[in-house]
Amino acid sequence: MYPRLKIYLKRIEENTRVIRQLCAGYGIRVMGVTKACCGAPELAEAYQAGGLAMIGDSRVANLKKMENIKAEKWLIRPPMLSEIEDLVRYADVSLQSEMETVRAINKECEKQRKRHKIILMMDLGDIREGYVDEEELIAAAVETEKLSHVDLYGIGTNLTCFSFIQADEEKMERLAEMRKKVENAAGHTLEIVSGGNSAALDLMMRGGICEGVDNFRLGESLLFGKERSRYTFLPGTRNDGFILECEVVEAKVKPSLPWGTAGVDSYGRKPVFTNRGEKRKKVICAIGRQDFDAETATPVDEGILILGASSDHLMLDVTDSVKEYKVGDIVELRLGYFSVLRAFTSPYVEKIFLKK
């Protein structure tokens, strides 16, 4: 049945091993993020096989899927108050920026007779989650340390996700300095200072991560073998862990340019087309924007050009391919991060996990 997404777990495992070893050389421990694959336990197992002991996701529902995975599990998005019961049940660690939530977690832990680890987040410019005021963060740390059923595990920051503010030496030094202030105020040595995501790898390799920052939350780099700051591939990794197969439903010769009065698309944009001639071999595949992101997909056949997609049609120019595509043929696409995220979320895409 098509479309279907093939996930090559051994390739992801090898990426994980290479990047874990790379980070270890700089004193950085890695937590593997599964959110692009909707918390698939198979992905968590590939991370574990690559040497990771910490697994994280942004949704409690995804952590629930990994209930039987023997790893330290993190919730990497501040939880809703309405899901605290399940958070305590399925997560060992969570990133927090509101003491009201931390208090609710402490109360629920008492009910469930469990303990939960808290990482307090500091906003260093991305204006997403975290404390901006240092004194507020310190006060939160002191209060957390006094609570009966939660542990002050560490502090962290998030960059390059909303405003796409980059990690730099100054921001990492400020985070490390905050570690000292929190430890002095709370009278407690922090086990974790989480300095960011795959976008921080470039800074790390340039020697820009100072002592005191010891953890990264990585997803994209493990899955696709590249850091997110400059989008360069890391040595020894590969980017073919996710191959989408889609079926051709129309194959015809058509002009490269549309004709008639042009309007805007469903996203408020006016499409732009390049004149490649009056006779181009084009195919339509039965998949669209509801199922994947055409902008972060690359045809395996280098002779294919992605023209664009509507909600459930993918238009391709196959004129330069050595293969003569016809109805019923299969086109393979190598997927990037957002394309994988959308494909995993779509119920119309079959997922096939391959242990190779």
Where in this protein do the model-derived segments appear?
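Active-site anion/phosphate-binding pocket segments in diverse small-molecule metabolic enzymes
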Residues: 173-356
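Glycine-rich phosphate/diphosphate-binding loops that line cofactor/substrate pockets in enzymes
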Residues: 20-24, 113-114
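Short aromatic-glycine motifs in intrinsically disordered, low-complexity regions
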Residues: 1-2, 139-142, 146, 229-239
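N-terminal capping/small domains of soluble enzymes
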Residues: 16-18, 25, 36-49, 62-63, ...
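Active-site-proximal beta-alpha core segment in soluble small-molecule metabolic enzymes
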Residues: 6, 28-173, 177, 185
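Generic N-terminal amphipathic, Lys/Arg-enriched alpha-helix
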Residues: 1-7, 11
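Alpha-helical packing segments of well-folded alpha/beta enzyme cores
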Residues: 12-15, 19, 178
